[in-house]
Amino acid sequence: MKNNILCLAMMMLTIMCSCGQKETKQELFNGKNLDGWTCVLDESSTLPTTDVYGVKDGNIHIVGNPFGYMRTAQKYNNDKLHAEWRWIGEGTNSGLFLHVQDGDKLWPNAIECQLCNGKTGDFVMLGGSKIAEVES
């Protein structure tokens, strides 16, 4: 009897663990164009965004000037981000903006994860954003 109860408990535990929410992967870049992205340039720029941001050979290409950024048109939460990048030539000041707040301005309220050679992984608070330690 004890073995039957133990087997039943193990089966129920296995079923409950396998019923958990599965992670789904969503590609943010389709490799063809910038559909699903919003490109923002410094308001003093006279260039169209298409002269700065584009797609070449399945990769996003960004010209270094003027200042600006790209963001996804859709908002995400509870996410994991995987990014790959490389510099052709000497790396310059660049980064990934995280938790960008509404309002497409330069510089937005956001956290920047620095990608510049020698500073990769540093966090920079942009647009007056603040970070605080929360005790639990």
Where do the PLM segments sit?
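Bacterial Sec-dependent N-terminal signal peptides
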Residues: 1-24
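Carbohydrate-interacting regions of secretory-pathway proteins
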Residues: 19-136
